Structure formats: C-alpha cells, structure tokens
C-alpha cells in the first residue's frame, strides 16, 4: 500500500468513493469536484493504482485571541466499502497529521460523523454552538444584556416594534436610530436572491471581531457556502438601514415544521435583534438558531450547547508556543501529554511562562511529572471551548490541585466560532 497526495488522474476515483459514502446531491458533487476539491489538497491510500481511502484538506486561516494562523479543514474521510474496518482510516489520519506538521500547520479541525471515533484518536471539541428555540411570538427586549462582547448601544436610543409579517410579504419596515442621530430612519429586512459576498463578508468580519475567534472566509469560501446554501433551499435575509446599507444578514432555511437559522451576523445589537425578531415571525413557525457559544447582546431563553467541530494538534511544541496567552503569568510546569497517534507529541514537556503572553515547551524525557493531559484535552484548552472551571470538572488536566488551577489561568474560556461545512 502507498499513501500519497492525489493527482489529477485520481479525481475520478475520489469522486466514486465520495458518491459511495455520502448522500450529497449530484449538483453539489459536480460543483465540489470542479470548483473546490483540488488534487494536491487530497491524500489517499492506494493499492497499485486503486484508491482505497482518501480525504480532503481545505486550507483555512483561524483567528484566535487576536492572532491568526494557518489551518486545514479535514473533509470527506471515506473508504471504499469493501476495504472498510481494516484500519485504513486511522493509518491515513496519522499520515495526514504528520504531513500537516511538516508544512507548519499545528492545528487541524473537522466536523465529525462520529465523535467517539475521533476523540479516542486525540481530537477534542474546538467549536460548539448554542441552539436557541424561539417561538413565532418571541419578543426581543430593547435593553441589551450586560457583559456582552462587541458593540453596545445606549438605552433609550432605539425603537423596534415587533414586525407584522403578512402572507406573501418578504420585507418589513421598522424604525431605527443609527449613530448619534435623534431622528427616526426607516430600516428594512428583506430576502436577497443574489447577495454580494463582499457585503456578507464585511458584516461577518465586523460581527466576528467581537468573538474570541473564528474561521476567516475567503471569496472562494463564500462562493461555496452560498452555492451549497441555495442548493439546499436556503435563503439570505438582509437587514438594511438608511445611510449605512446592510447591517445584518441571516443564512435561513424555511422548514415544514420549524425554520432553521444557520447563521446570523450583525454590526450592532439593534440590527441583530430586529433581524431575529423578524425571522422568528416568518411563516408563523418556531425558529431554531445555531449561534456562537458566546454571550448575546439581548436576553434569550437558555440554549442547548452542542459540540459541532473537533480540533487536533499535529505539532505539540508549535501549538503550545504560539502566542495565545494572557500576559502577566509566570511559572514552569512538567506537563505529561498523551497522544494515541503521534509518538512525537507523546511525552513530558517543560512548559515555561515568562509573563509576556508566550510560553516555551521543551521535551524533557524521563522527568517527574506535575500535570497530565491528552492531546484532545489540550485542543479544548487552546481553543477555549473548556475554561478552567469545566477543565477541572471534566478532569482534562490532572495533578496537584494548586498547580492545575494556576496552569489553567493560561487558558481562559473562549468562543471560537466555526460554521463552515467544507
């Protein structure tokens, strides 16, 4: 068996395996293999010229705590049916992680088909969503909730009546106050059939800047997202204000029993609240919103928190030494890391923090251990999906209680937002 990068002549077989393994529409598969999946981004295991198992590594950049770094989205891991349950997927994943490590990519992520398959191989939750269920009569109070990231507005500066959605209507007029003006200006929420990706990206970047982290989308990423969204019957809704243009958008799916809001991004709390209040009333059906795992600028019912993405460290030393840490913390710990796939990540590291927001990680084989964790647990800490309190509760890090508590101050709770499907 040979494991290597795919070439152009392998794409027909890669498509065969995809069609055999996934229930995607032919139009999507045509687009994906024509526009998205480049041979050099695929890795496969071959027996002679026969492709047995393969995956796709889509390049992305991640912004986390004010820093950006290259990453790869692991997509479409699949094996020909007659070659399954022979350990090929595990072998391919190991090769892939080492390949990424050589390219300087210390962190990769995926949307799992089975959580347990990946977590036992060293993946950990790196992206989770809050699932809100809103009734058609939901009212969003004008007063913003406290302690909210991003922009806030002064109380009493806005007026937002609950919209009435008449049958057949696709727009609603509202009253809005923008900036420091005191005059009321018209605002409108409407469905957009040909959205400008640049406009959506402007809103996405402005909105996500208040989050702890997110995936940065390129023009190509937006093209794929919109193609897939419309192919599945999705709609784009924009909230527009006079003088400032669109200030919020929604990736919306009308459903038979309930509507799904895949993503809502907004430049001000007022724009987000009005967009949500309008969509909650569409078709007089409940609205299910998959939102970031972060505080909102308006109160909503308690959500369900759902893990969506898993992350994997490929290079432990590089991941730990990337400057993501709060300044002012100093200390040294002998950290034992357990990695079920990569022996080069498995062992004892001397982790030293010098108070400048950076740490060093030096392998020290054979030394006594202060703290122990897995690569999956460390992925959770780095991404912020588990803050210190949850890390202690779930025993993601073990050792002396005082050492654990102090070390975890390096890893505050965050809200890395991921919501792309390929």
Predicted regions and their residues:
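Active-site/acyl-donor-binding loops of N-acyltransferases
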Residues: 122-143, 262-422
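Hydrophobic pocket-lining residues that define ligand/cofactor binding sites across diverse proteins
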Residues: 83, 100, 279
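Conserved acetyl-CoA pyrophosphate-binding loop and the N-cap/start of the following alpha-helix
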Residues: 83-95, 270-274
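Conserved GNAT acetyl-CoA-binding A-motif
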Residues: 100-112, 283-292
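Amide-forming acyltransferase catalytic core, primarily the GNAT-like/NAT-type
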Residues: 129-156, 161, 173-175, 179-278, ...
């Amino acid at each position: 068996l040979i494991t290597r990068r795919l070439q152009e002549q392998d794409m027909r077989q890669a498509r065969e395996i995809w069609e055999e393994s996934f229930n995607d529409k032919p139009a999507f598969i045509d687009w994906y293999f024509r526009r998205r999946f480049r041979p050099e981004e695929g890795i496969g295991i071959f027996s002679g010229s026969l492709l047995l198992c393969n995956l796709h590594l889509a390049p992305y950049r991640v912004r986390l705590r004010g820093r950006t770094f290259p990453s790869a989205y692991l997509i479409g891991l699949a094996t020909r049916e007659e070659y399954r349950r022979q350990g090929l997927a595990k072998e391919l994943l190991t090769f892939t992680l080492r390949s990424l490590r050589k390219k300087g990519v210390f962190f990769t992520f995926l949307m799992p088909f089975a959580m347990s398959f990946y977590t036992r191989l060293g993946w950990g939750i790196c992206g989770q969503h809050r699932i809100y269920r809103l009734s058609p009569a939901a009212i969003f109070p004008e007063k913003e909730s406290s302690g909210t990231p991003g922009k806030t507005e002064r109380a009493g500066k806005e007026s937002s009546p609950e919209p009435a959605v008449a049958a057949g209507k696709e727009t609603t007029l509202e009253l809005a106050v923008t900036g420091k003006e005191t005059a009321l200006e018209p605002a409108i929420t409407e469905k957009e059939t040909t959205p400008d990706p640049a406009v959506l990206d402007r809103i996405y970047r402005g909105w996500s800047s208040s989050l702890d982290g997110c995936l940065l989308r390129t023009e190509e990423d937006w093209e794929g997202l919109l193609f897939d969204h419309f192919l599945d019957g999705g709609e784009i809704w924009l909230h527009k204000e006079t003088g400032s243009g669109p200030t919020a958008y929604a990736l919306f799916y009308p459903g038979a029993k309930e509507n799904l809001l895949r993503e809502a991004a907004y430049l001000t709390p007022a724009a987000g609240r009005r967009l949500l209040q309008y969509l909650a009333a569409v078709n007089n059906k409940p609205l299910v919103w998959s939102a970031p795992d972060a505080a909102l600028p308006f109160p909503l019912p308690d959500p369900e928190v759902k893990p969506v993405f898993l992350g994997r460290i490929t290079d432990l030393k590089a991941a730990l030494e990337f400057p993501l840490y709060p300044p002012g913390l100093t200390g040294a710990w002998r950290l034992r890391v357990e990695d079920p796939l990569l022996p080069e990540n498995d062992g004892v590291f001397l982790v030293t923090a010098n108070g400048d927001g950076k740490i060093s990680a030096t392998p020290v084989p054979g030394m006594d251990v202060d703290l122990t964790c897995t690569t999956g647990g460390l992925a959770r800490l780095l991404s912020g999906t588990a803050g210190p309190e949850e890390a202690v509760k779930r025993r993601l890090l073990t050792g002396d209680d005082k050492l654990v508590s102090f070390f975890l101050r390096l890893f505050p709770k965050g809200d890395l937002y991921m919501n792309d499907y390929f």
